[in-house]
């Protein structure tokens, strides 16, 4: 089976017309949940269920409300709560230099002055720039803004990120 990457989790239904609420976990949510997009549905044990074609999608608060083709009633989609939607690797677009997909960054080792400080576990999108969450042993998570003075170098092939922890970031 080809490689798939998680783009969201179905967290609930929306209304009676077969729409679902999806909590996005992707860097291109508008594209992933727009009309015509094809997503793969996986159950809570990561078993492939079927491909889904987006009929409509809209942002509502922190969720995307999505209607898939062929699902017309709440009873058609209620069983998919907790399931995950993914995109096939072949459907990902090429990125420009200096751009990365979340799955390329999450799991990378983070170094400050060549000292391993942790691993990126999550990427948040609170506003102007992304924030990378670094899991550390014996310490609380470190929140790193993805800005040039902090993130010095990203080596996707080596799963390595070099950073400069500025004063005040690790208090």
From Swiss-Prot:
Chief localization: cytoplasm
Single GO cellular component term: cytoplasm
InterPro entries: PRC-brl_dom (IPR027275), PRC_barrel-like_sf (IPR011033), RimM (IPR011961), RimM_N (IPR002676), RimM_N_sf (IPR036976), Transl_B-barrel_sf (IPR009000)
Origin superkingdom: Bacteria
Notes on the domains: The PRC barrel domain binds ribosomal protein uS19.
Function per UniProt: An accessory protein needed during the final step in the assembly of 30S ribosomal subunit, possibly for assembly of the head region. Essential for efficient processing of 16S rRNA. May be needed both before and after RbfA during the maturation of 16S rRNA. It has affinity for free ribosomal 30S subunits but not for 70S ribosomes.
PANTHER family: RIBOSOME MATURATION FACTOR RIMM
Subunit structure: Binds ribosomal protein uS19.
Protein name: Ribosome maturation factor RimM
Source organism: Lactococcus lactis subsp. cremoris (strain MG1363)
Lineage of source species: Bacteria, Bacillati, Bacillota, Bacilli, Lactobacillales
Encoding gene, per UniProt annotation: rimM
